[in-house]
Amino acid sequence: MAAGPVRGLAVAGGGESSESEDDGWEIGYLDRSAQKLKGPLLPEEKNETFKKALTTGDISLVQELLDSGLSVDSSFRYGWTPLMYAASVSNVELVRVLLDRGANASFEKDNQTILITACSARGSEEQILKCVELLLSRNADPNVACRRLMTPIMYAARDGHPQVVALLVAHGAEVNTQDENGYTALTWAARQGHKNVVLKLLELGANKMLQTKDGKTPSEIAKRNKHLEIFNFLSFTLNPLEGKLQQLTKEETICKLLTTDSDKEKDHIFSSYTAFGDLEIFLHGLGLEHMTDLLKERDITLRHLLTMRKDEFTKNGITNRDQQKILAALKELEVEEIKFGELPEVAKLEISGDEFLNFLLKLNKQCGHLITAVQNIISELPVNSHKIVLEWSSPRNFTSVCEELVSNVEDLSEEVCKLKDLIQKLQNERENDPTHIPLMEEVSTWNSRILKRTAVTVCGFGFLLFICKLTFQRK
């Protein structure tokens, strides 16, 4: 069976660049009809014709060249073999022919295996899956890593191929292996936003608590890259998918994971989680999932829960242990407030300078807390509306409140400027007042200067008398 023309570029798999832009292959979109050898060819001509046949996907010409004695594991420029090239463009029929002719499925060049090349190929998942399956059937090792310690499952997860991930695990791929940066397959999937791969890996027992070298978990990596659906899902304390398929046999796993029904099921599971409201997300984050049904039965919203008193907690059947978790979370969410009732009455004329300065410092600190709170909110909000997980009310409500905030901030700025001008005026008048009595600090400074000058003068006279006395004694 002849394969259609190849429409793709020959690139080094796994994101590893070639040592040169010209690796001896014809790069581009080629569509050539099948060719036949017109006569005997020199070895150099055979190699060149072989490369062209591989580039165009001309199966019949490839077979004819192999029949003429050309090695199936011929090493082209920079060490690529025909099978590695065929895998890099996901040409299933070409991969099959080369393997049937004895091509080495375990070949590697500079820690770049053919399986890694296939998993990182540019093509449809269906084509990549078939190529990977052929290579695994010829005992290609799914746990051999490249120079960056990335294994085939990491490349498949990074590029968003859940079925390829499942197939690799079914053939013994380690789910929780980490690369040179501490990334696992789950971390790569979370980083790239591939939710179906995330779910598949969790089913296969991926550890969502493994950290990268800079101390980040997959959920934190997802959050940093604005994949909030994945972040919320991975943040759940309990996960009904975790390790779901670990106890199945190899054959059962392949059958289970390569069916279209499983994809529909996982989409349903994920959508049920991402449809959670703010109450469910809050409870899952605290490990209080068991309270969800209880609160829903009593029509208790998150706003109501966060404003409950001690007696209301008990009345609604919330245990002391759960109460402590909620109260601890509330304490972390609180913004430090100034208790203005404890501050001095600024209007009183007898207020001390220290008290007034303390008031201004606390006011400034409060403004700093408010600025930090707003900055944190801005950094957490998704850039695109389709990434918002929780159900929000009309955006107009938020815009209206923000407009009021801006107005209040402008009013505050105006009042602070008035206060500053008033203080400056008082300071200028005070300095120009002839009846102004210097502060003790100023008086003590002046006295110390006089004392120092007096001491120097006395010492000077003493030294002069000593010189005179010494002179008289010598005479």
UniProtKB/Swiss-Prot annotation:
Segments forming domain SAM: 272-334
Q: Per UniProt, which keywords does this protein have?
A: ANK repeat, Cytoplasm, Developmental protein, Differentiation, Meiosis, Phosphoprotein, Repeat, RNA-mediated gene silencing, Spermatogenesis
An example of a Pfam family matching this protein is Ank_2
Compartment annotation: Cytoplasm
Q: Does the keyword Repeat apply?
A: yes
Name its GO BP terms in alphabetical order.
cell differentiation; male meiotic nuclear division; regulatory ncRNA-mediated gene silencing; spermatogenesis; transposable element silencing
InterPro entries for the chain: Ankyrin_rpt (IPR002110), Ankyrin_rpt-contain_sf (IPR036770), Asz1_SAM (IPR042650), SAM (IPR001660), SAM/pointed_sf (IPR013761)
Q: Which residues carry this modification: Phosphoserine?
A: 17-18, 20
Assembly = Interacts with DDX4, PIWIL1, RANBP9 and TDRD1.
Per the record, the domain of life is Eukaryota
Annotated protein name in UniProt: Ankyrin repeat, SAM and basic leucine zipper domain-containing protein 1
UniProt-listed PROSITE patterns: ANK_REP_REGION (PS50297), ANK_REPEAT (PS50088)
Keyword Cytoplasm carried by entry: yes
Name where the ANK repeats lie. 45-74, 78-107, 110-144, 148-177, 181-210, 214-243
What is this protein's function? Plays a central role during spermatogenesis by repressing transposable elements and preventing their mobilization, which is essential for the germline integrity. Acts via the piRNA metabolic process, which mediates the repression of transposable elements during meiosis by forming complexes composed of piRNAs and Piwi proteins and governs the methylation and subsequent repression of transposons. Its association with pi-bodies suggests a participation in the primary piRNAs metabolic process.
Any one cellular-component term (Gene Ontology): pi-body
- The segment annotated Disordered runs over 1-24
Question: Which PANTHER family does UniProt cross-reference here?
Answer: ANKYRIN REPEAT, SAM AND BASIC LEUCINE ZIPPER DOMAIN-CONTAINING PROTEIN 1 (PTHR24157:SF3)
